[in-house]
Structures are given as structure tokens and as C-alpha cells.
């Protein structure tokens, strides 16, 4: 069994519908329990194949093309869910993610003045772009 290439539906839920911005896959059993079954995500610069330890999770943009390769033996157990972000636009979420990574790298190098400037930029972009 596998799951063909697709992007996730833009809206999830029943009566309380929400926008699916981020997809979540939680691996409930380990890679040794089955053959195949990799989560394959098209990153735009190639395909990333993911098969993680039990209890591990992967988050990825819900609009990313992805599939699950065929399970050839054993059983693949996962839980999937979706998250609505306060930042609707995936490009803006990527910018914020890059800023957080840069901020954390600056913090590791103990540069408090530059850290504060990057943190201020992050906070102000959140203020501009976030939706409750």
C-alpha cells in the first residue's frame, strides 16, 4: 500500500473548519517494522524521503506535493494532522523561519546587539502579518 502524489486539502474539519497550512506526520512505529513506506516530499529542489523513529514527527507545508511509497512488508503506523498558522502565506512563514534560524545562530555567537535587531525584525513582521 502507498499513497499517490498530492497536496493536502486547503480546508479541514467538520463544522469547525480550519485552513491547513502545515501538515504533520507522527511516526507511531519504527523503520525496522516495515519496508518501504517513506514519506516523500517535493522540496522544490528535489525529493526528500523520510522514515523516522517511533514518536518522531515531521512538519511540512500542506501545499507541498508529497506521497508515501509503497509498503512492501510489515505495517506502517502514523498519525497525521494539520495546523492553521497565524501566518497565512507560506512565503512569509519561510521568511520568519529563516529569521528565527539566523537569530539563533547570532545568539550562539554571543552578539547581543545584532540578536536584538534580528529579534525586533521578527517581532515586527509577526505584528504585520499575523492573523488571530
Q: Where is each model-derived feature located?
A:
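Catalytic core of non-heme Fe(II) oxygenases with the double-stranded beta-helix
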Residues: 1-91, 96-97
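Charged/polar low-complexity intrinsically disordered segments, enriched in acidic residues
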Residues: 87-126
Amino acid at each position: 500500500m502507498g499513497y499517490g502524489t498530492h497536496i493536502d486539502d486547503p480546508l479541514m474539519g467538520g463544522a469547525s473548519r480550519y485552513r491547513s497550512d502545515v501538515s504533520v506526520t507522527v511516526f507511531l512505529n519504527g523503520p525496522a517494522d516495515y519496508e518501504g513506506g517513506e514519506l516523500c516530499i517535493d522540496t522544490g529542489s528535489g525529493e526528500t524521503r523520510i522514515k523516522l523513529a517511533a514518536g518522531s514527527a515531521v512538519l511540512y507545508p500542506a501545499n507541498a506535493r508529497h506521497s508515501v511509497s509503497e509498503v512492501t512488508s510489515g505495517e506502517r503506523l502514523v498519525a497525521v494532522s494539520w495546523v492553521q498558522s497565524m501566518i497565512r502565506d507560506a512565503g512569509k512563514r519561510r521568511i520568519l523561519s529563516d529569521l528565527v534560524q539566523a537569530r539563533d545562530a547570532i545568539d550562539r555567537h554571543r552578539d547581543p546587539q545584532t540578536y536584538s535587531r534580528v529579534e525586533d525584525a521578527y517581532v515586527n513582521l509577526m505584528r504585520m502579518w499575523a492573523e488571530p
